[in-house]
Amino acid sequence: MPIEIVCKIKFAEEDAKPKEKEAGDEQSLLGAAQGPAAPRDLATFASTSTLHGLGRACGPGPHGLRRTLWVLALLTSLAAFLYQAASLARGYLTRPHLVAMDPAAPAPVAGFPAVTLCNINRFRHSALSDADIFHLANLTGLPPKDRDGHRAAGLRYPEPDMVDILNRTGHQLADMLKSCNFSGHHCSASNFSVVYTRYGKCYTFNADPQSSLPSRAGGMGSGLEIMLDIQQEEYLPIWRETNETSFEAGIRVQIHSQEEPPYIHQLGFGVSPGFQTFVSCQKQRLTYLPQPWGNCRAESKLREPELQGYSAYSVSACRLRCEKEAVLQRCHCRMVHMPGNETICPPNIYIECADHTLDSLGGGSEGPCFCPTPCNLTRYGKEISMVKIPNRGSARYLARKYNRNETYIRENFLVLDVFFEALTSEAMEQRAAYGLSALLGDLGGQMGLFIGASILTLLEILDYIYEVSWDRLKRVWRRPKTPLRTSTGGISTLGLQELKEQSPCPNRGRAEGGGASNLLPNHHHPHGPPGSLFEDFAC
């Protein structure tokens, strides 16, 4: 009895596909529309890229010695560029800066600085009462006494007032000042204001920033010239050494701006009796860089409540504020020269607590009182010279004039002359030596020299990477699932790989391997157009 193979074959018309797609992997064989075109391969991208040498190294063409040399040249140039780029980046991250000096044109008028002076001796011996000596014993080293002699036991005195003691026993400028002239005009002690420092009662000339005196010419005779008597006979005798014991004789002087409080124990210079000291000044305007190039304090951060009592931020004001906070925290009081309205420390706390607290504070960048330099600063450069006074003739004259002997004149009198060298200010400004624009320019030059690339070339490479990555993701997301044969016996769609794994149609008498399955992969409908491809198969 004859055996038949019953199969149903369905064909559909479709445009011819490229030959390379005929061996596809797991594409649908039934009604599946062809997906979007695959992205360019590396060879195609290399042949169209603007990166020099990439087309010859990775483009289409035979592989040989020439291509190998181009690959080596490309890799060498790329390595050289990366090395230079790393060096440029390291140089930029060091934040180098330079200092530019710009001497300004002479001005007709220049504001004269503030001049603060202090006698090195804090307390006049003749002005100390028995109570003062008793309370200041630890500071001065003098033994307490009464009218009957030194008798420490059983003495009772009222509580001391440190402000009153300093004001009353300090050297009075009216007694020390023998002559005063400013720009050829007479001045007096009334032109000085009282200020308290670590040296006690001191005096500042031209202290008011709202009415600072002008200097209309440079050179000697156009500034401040004063003659002082330091009153060495009022210096305290030394019975024993203390932290406050001083062996010097003379005055301390600081030249500063009106907005800056005096910090004379560290920033002042000494003037000796028996000499005329000339101080030639030059105004300097300094501009520093903030982070990341420097460590200056920017103007936007100046308005802080910690600097109450000062019109502007300065290193001196910051230091005084920090010292005050430290003394307040440890001693529960403040020293006379510190700003604020808190309780003044009594003399015994000065030596037992306050002085030790100040000595423990560091002044460097690691200390608790680190104060950054303001980004805009005015200071006065100084050149100091001196000559000995008096000569023999003037010694006799001064002795008669002030009713003193010549020895006293030589040991106590001094002359201080402060003036502008010229009415010009010197501007010094920190500038970034290597900024971002310079870095980008150097990187662009190195990139063009070694690999012939630009920013647009980098965008081309990123665009190609995006195109390839996006195509891979879409393939993963849209991978078709293999449908199963329906229970109704309808037509099922089989993938090509699954079709190869399927057993042939049921055989009704043919020899094994003689089924129609061998015919199907390249089967064309006898009446169909020559471009038709196999699509549907049912068995």
UniProtKB/Swiss-Prot annotation:
Disulfide bonds join C118-C202, C180-C187, C296-C375, C318-C371, C322-C369, C331-C353, C333-C345. Residues 501-531 are annotated as: Disordered. The keyword Disulfide bond applies. Belongs to the amiloride-sensitive sodium channel (TC 1.A.6) family. ASIC4 subfamily. Does not exhibit measurable stand-alone pH-gated sodium channel activity but may form pH-gated heterotrimeric sodium channels. Its activity could also depend on alternative gating mechanisms. It is a multi-pass membrane protein. Residues 1-68, 460-539 are cytoplasmic. One of its GO terms (biological process) is sodium ion transmembrane transport. Keywords: Cell membrane, Disulfide bond, Glycoprotein, Ion channel, Ion transport, Membrane, Sodium, Sodium channel, Sodium transport, Transmembrane, Transmembrane helix, Transport. It comes from Rattus norvegicus (Rat). Glycans are attached at N191, N243, N341, N376. InterPro entries: ENaC, ENaC_CS. Expressed in brain, spinal cord and dorsal root ganglion (DRG). Expressed by a subset of sensory neurons in the DRG. Expressed by granule cells in the cerebellar cortex. In hippocampus, expression is detected in dentate gyrus granule cells, in pyramidal cells of CA1-CA3 subfields and in interneurons of the striatum oriens and radiatum of all subfields. In cerebral cortex expressed in small, medium and large pyramidal cells in layers 2, 3 and 5 respectively. Residues 90-438 are extracellular. It is found in: Cell membrane. It comes from the Eukaryota. The chain crosses the membrane at residues 69-89, 439-459. This is Acid-sensing ion channel 4. One of its GO terms (cellular component) is plasma membrane. Homotrimer. Heterotrimer; with other ASIC proteins producing functional channels. A motif (GAS motif) lies at residues 452-454. PANTHER family: ACID-SENSING ION CHANNEL 4, AMILORIDE-SENSITIVE SODIUM CHANNEL-RELATED. Signal peptide: none annotated.
